[in-house]
Amino acid sequence: MSATQYYGTGRRKTSTARVFAKVGSGNIVVNQRPLDEYFGRETARMVVRQPLELVEMTEKLDIYVTVKGGGITGQAGAIRHGITRALMELDEALRPSLRAAGFVTRDARKVERKKVGLRKARRKPQFSKR
């Protein structure tokens, strides 16, 4: 792998994102589509840009992403995690500020499985006293 390209893997819920960052003009491409076209929701686009805005590299890096699995929120979170890891590979001095913002830690929350005898993961059937 060339020294000009930086890689980070991000995960969130059931989504996995492979992020490649290189010096450029600030283009973000997700699954061969521009960020604004891929994510319809403004909140998802904002989540993806958070680590770049924090370290003020929005216009300095081109980001190329391949993301699989999950929904909009999970994919946006996975991309954010991947971008954070790629930034740390680029410059280890960015780690403390990214850690303070909470971008380095992988969000371990996943959907809890449904249990036998219950309606959902924790919702019990209605109880009738008589």
Curated annotation (Swiss-Prot):
Pfam families in the cross-refs: Ribosomal_S9
UniProt keyword list: Ribonucleoprotein, Ribosomal protein
PROSITE patterns: RIBOSOMAL_S9 (PS00360)
Domain of life according to the entry: Bacteria
Classification via InterPro entries: Ribosomal_Su5_D2-typ_SF, Ribosomal_uS9, Ribosomal_uS9_bac/plastid, Ribosomal_uS9_CS, Ribsml_uS5_D2-typ_fold_subgr
Keyword Ribonucleoprotein: yes
Keyword field contains Ribosomal protein: yes
GO biological process: translation
One CC-aspect GO term: cytosolic small ribosomal subunit
Gene Ontology MF annotations: RNA binding; structural constituent of ribosome
Transmembrane feature ranges: none
HAMAP family per record: Ribosomal_uS9_B (MF_00532_B)
Family: Belongs to the universal ribosomal protein uS9 family.
Protein name, as recorded: Small ribosomal subunit protein uS9
Species per Swiss-Prot/TrEMBL record: Shewanella loihica (strain ATCC BAA-1088 / PV-4)
